[in-house]
Regions:
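Short recognition helix of helix-turn-helix/winged-helix DNA-binding domains
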Residues: 1-57, 62-65
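Winged helix-turn-helix DNA-binding recognition segment
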Residues: 39-103
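Alpha-helix boundary/capping detector
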Residues: 61, 93-94, 110-112, 130
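A contiguous pocket-lining binding segment that forms or flanks enzyme active sites
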Residues: 117-140
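Conserved small/polar residues in nucleotide/adenosyl-binding loops
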Residues: 144-146
Length: 146
């Protein structure tokens, strides 16, 4: 059965400016796109030799090497972009000796075949301001993938 999947993405002006920018031909949105596509929509056990975890809704498992080979970008470039995405709180990444778990913080929800799936890791813009996670002017941008 083919699913109809839409994404509710909320970004601050600073986050959007970073993702829209490009340096040395690197498309940062492509990297975010790979993470969004890899995110699970229900709890999922994951195991490879020497590593196992339970992925929650809104988490993706992709190593920097995997991202590098999928996008044909240098691994060091992927690492720098992910570091900046973490700094801007677009994602939160945790590395192990085998792979990385990326928690998507910019996705508020998914709509799958008309059913809303909330992201438990999403932090509302209002709460980001109160927590001091983002300073300066913020604007909401909701993108729906059709």
């Amino acid at each position: 059965m083919k699913t109809n999947l839409n994404y509710c993405i909320v970004l601050s002006s600073e986050q959007l400016a970073y993702l829209a920018g490009s340096k040395y031909g690197i498309d940062r949105m492509k990297i975010l796109h790979q993470l969004i596509e890899a995110a699970v929509l229900e709890e999922n056990d994951y195991a490879i030799k020497g590593f196992s975890t339970t992925l929650q809704v809104g988490q993706a498992i992709l190593s920097e090497v995997d991202l590098s080979s999928k996008l044909d970008y240098d691994k060091k470039t992927i690492s720098r972009v992910l570091d900046k995405m973490n700094q801007l709180r677009i994602v939160a990444s945790a590395q192990s000796n085998r792979t990385s778990v990326h928690t998507l913080k910019c996705i508020s929800a998914w709509m799958e075949n008309g059913n809303r799936i909330d992201n438990p890791f999403y932090v509302r813009i209002k709460n980001r301001q109160e927590e001091g996670e983002n300073t300066g002017a913020l604007s909401n941008l909701s993108l729906i993938h059709i």
